[in-house]
Amino acid sequence: TLNYESNPYMNENWFQRACLVGDASTSGISCVITNEAINEILDISGIDDVNTVYSGSFPSQMVAGLNEGVGFFNYRGYYGVSGFGSSDVNSTSNGYMLPVATVITCGTGSFGSSSGESLIESFIRAGTPSNPKGSVVCIGTATLGTHTMFNNLVDMGFYYGALIEGIETPGAALMYGKMMLY
């Protein structure tokens, strides 16, 4: 993170790209609709190179999306993240092109689990200082049994807060997303 902030990788326009993933198979079409709304927010903000993934082999497309280099990576779906897991994060090769990742679905942020590190831990711990991968920040949920409609609102609110309202830190943008519940 220190190198990311003090010496950011500025080649290409990777930070002007995004990958949005929505799996409607279990949680319903609202996961796709949420990503379409986020896509509109990105477009308003000048980010129009957006890879959308709504079907097919989710894990391989998600790894490819991260490897391409994106400023934002978003997943909306269900518990299990459509088969995408820690090993997929560790197989990425995005180098210093580290996105802000949002994986706001059941159990992605369950730190201290007996089953190993959570997905968001994998995102921020992947790689090494000389060979980074994963993401610079990752936001998820800490428990099982969350609800799609609430997760969708928090997700859209995060992006609205960060990109439309100009909220500069991920924590504050997440709080903005949570405030959308009220």
Question: What spans do the regions from the language model cover?
Answer:
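Cysteine-dependent hydrolase recognition
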Residues: 1-182
